[in-house]
A protein has these predicted regions:
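Structured, hydrophobic secondary-structure cores that serve as assembly/anchoring elements
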Residues: 142, 148-152, 156-158, 162, ...
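Exposed beta-sheet edge/beta-hairpin loop segments within beta-rich domains
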Residues: 63-66, 156-166, 250-253, 373-385, ...
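Alpha-helical scaffold segments that mediate packing/assembly in large oligomeric complexes
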Residues: 154-243
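Hydrophobic alpha-helical segments involved in membrane association or supramolecular assembly
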Residues: 74, 169, 173, 181, ...
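Short acidic, glycine/tyrosine-flanked loop/strand segments centered on an H-E-D-like triad
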Residues: 129-158, 353-365, 370
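Amphipathic alpha-helical scaffolding segments
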Residues: 91-95, 164-173, 276-280
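Sequence/fold signature of self-assembling virion shell proteins
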Residues: 2-58, 203-244, 254-413
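Assembly/oligomerization interface modules of large self-assembling protein complexes
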Residues: 57-144
Length: 413
């Protein structure tokens, strides 16, 4: 027997819940308006995508003030005793001018250091003058966005009752992946440390064609060499990560730097041997503490925590042409070797530039209009089509490029 619902006319003095399923009482709907709870869908989607954020968990957000343009600038002061501190202010202990004005700079040579100590005589004088250098770093924000459309009949007759929630979820996942890809791309392009495996000196010379031991394959020795370079660059060994569904909590991972790799390199890391031919890889279950794990973390090697990113980018067909290695290593167009990065990002090496953000999270602005009077106009006089759009601002400021490193390797099939 068909259900019978009361007429709205019988409740004209009350606010009526306009249940969309009660089609026979919609002829005289309450002024309270249509029922739609997109905020529930959006909240659930936000909770879901936190699990898919890899690079965002390392960055805080620098908020762009309103009415101040789209570019943010910061001063980066270089240390006094640093080869990058080049100026014309230098006077030595004898009062003579010398180049660079940074005493002995970054030198570790005992002879050079002992000869440039800023000693003073009894009368002092104009001696031991030094200078300082600062650099201006800057980043800009850009507005991003996309939209999708749907018809009233799609919502009413589609097999999936949760059609709208699925579209909201997938659009927010898409926006999150776009943001992650933007961050990853800028980190790969902005890295200040480049390391090439084997005998290669750049991506174009990456090869597996040489004698055994010269192939451009990542080894434990490469990882040790990279660790020393980052130590010399004063890259922090502790890493701050942003956690929680609201992305406002922070935790610190002590004595570890984060290395991001693609799934193509995972087996090479798991099978890696150290200098004593012992397994170098420590799987995550050996040390796991649920409060300090990163999204995608699989284990550790030396001083690095290894995170596998399923959407990790690579350089297609960037190496030499494969002959001996064809069918053994991954290749692209023209049978040239693909080159895969292992990306290391030091803590606070970069910051996201946001506009009207919340905490350290991107603030996505979603606009949804359901089919009906809200969307009806001369191009759609019957209001049959609705739409939803999502937009956000993205920008990134690389603060310490010398704390970002890319280790290049071929990948075994």
């Amino acid at each position: 027997m068909a259900n019978s619902y009361p007429s709205v006319d019988a409740n004209t003095q009350q606010a009526i819940y306009n249940n969309p399923q009660y089609t026979d009482n919609q002829a005289n709907p309450s002024s309270v308006g249509k029922q739609i709870r997109l905020d529930v869908y959006e909240k659930q989607a936000l909770l879901d995508i936190v699990k898919e954020q890899y690079f965002s968990q390392l960055a805080d957000t620098t908020d762009m003030p309103k009415n101040m343009g789209k570019t943010i600038k910061k001063f980066h002061w270089l240390p006094l005793l640093d080869d990058r501190n080049v100026n014309d202010q230098g006077l030595d202990a004898a009062g003579a001018s010398y180049a660079n004005g940074n005493l002995y700079g970054s030198s570790k040579d005992i002879g050079a250091i002992s000869g440039k100590m800023p000693t003073l005589t009894e009368v002092g004088g104009r001696v031991n003058r030094v200078g300082f250098t600062r650099k201006v770093i800057e980043g800009s924000i850009h507005k991003m966005g996309f939209f999708y459309e749907f018809t009233e009949e799609a919502m009413n007759f589609d097999t999936e009752a949760e059609l709208m929630s699925h579209m909201v979820r997938e659009s927010m996942r898409g926006a999150n992946e776009l943001t992650e890809d933007q961050i990853q791309l800028e980190l790969l392009q902005g890295a200040g440390v480049m390391v090439y495996t084997g005998t290669a000196t750049d991506k174009a010379t990456m090869s597996a064609e040489g004698a055994a031991g010269t192939e451009s394959l990542i080894t434990y020795k490469d990882i040790q060499r990279l660790s020393v370079t980052l130590d010399e660059n004063r890259c922090p060994k502790s890493t701050k990560i942003i956690t929680g569904s609201r992305m406002i909590d922070t935790k610190t991972i002590n004595s570890a730097r984060v290395m991001f790799i693609g799934s193509e390199l995972e087996n090479q890391f798991r099978n890696m041997l150290d200098a004593f031919n012992n397994p170098a890889f420590i799987p995550v279950e050996k040390y796991a503490d649920a409060g300090t794990l990163l999204n995608g973390e699989i284990g550790a090697i030396s001083q690095f925590r290894i995170v596998v990113v399923q959407e990790m980018m690579h350089w297609e067909a960037a190496g030499v042409t494969a002959v001996n290695g064809l069918g053994v290593y991954r290749t692209g167009a023209g049978n040239k070797y693909n080159v895969y990065p292992a990306l290391v990002v030091g803590s606070e090496a970069f910051t996201n530039i946001g506009f009207q953000t919340s905490g350290a999270n991107k603030k996505w602005k979603i606009t949804t209009k359901l089919p009906g009077a809200d969307t009806a106009d001369r191009t759609d006089p019957y209001g049959e089509t609705g739409f939803s759009s999502i937009k956000w601002y993205h920008g990134m400021l690389i603060q310490r490029p010398e704390w970002i490193a890319v280790l290049h390797s071929l990948a075994v099939l």
